[in-house]
Amino acid sequence: MPRFQFRLQQYLGVKEQIEDQKELEYAKALRVVEDEKQALAELIQRRNDSVESLRQSVQKAISPVEIRRYNNNIERLKHQIAVQIERVAAAEAFAEQKRQELVQAMKERKALEIVKENAKEEFLLEANLAEQKMVDELVSFKYAEKNS
C-alpha cells in the first residue's frame, strides 16, 4: 500500500514554526508585563517607605526644609508611579496583542491539521476500496478458474 503524503506538509510546517514564534513572542511580552509590575510595586514600596519615614520624622523635631524635601521626594515618586502605571498598561496591551496573534496562528495550524486528517482518511478509504476491489477480482478469477 502506498504511503500517505500530505501535499501541504511544508505549508503546515511553516504554520507550526509561525505558531512557535508567536508563542515565544507572547511569553516574552508576559515577562515584560511582570517586570513592569515589579517596577511599579518597588516604586509604591519606596513611596510608602518615604511617607512612613516622614511620619516618624514629624514626631521628632524636623525642620520645614526637611519636610519640603520629603514632600518633594514623595511627589516625585507619585509621578514615577503614574508613569509606571501607564507602562504596565501598555505592556499588558502589547501582551494581549501577542496573545491574539498566537490564538490566530493556532487556529490556522489546527485548520490545516484538520485538512490533513481529512485527506488521510480519504486516502485510507480509497486504499481500502482499491484493496477490496483487488481481493474481489482475485476471488472472481479463482472462482471462474475453478468453474471452468
Predicted stretch roles:
Residues 1-148:
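Charge-rich amphipathic alpha-helical interaction elements
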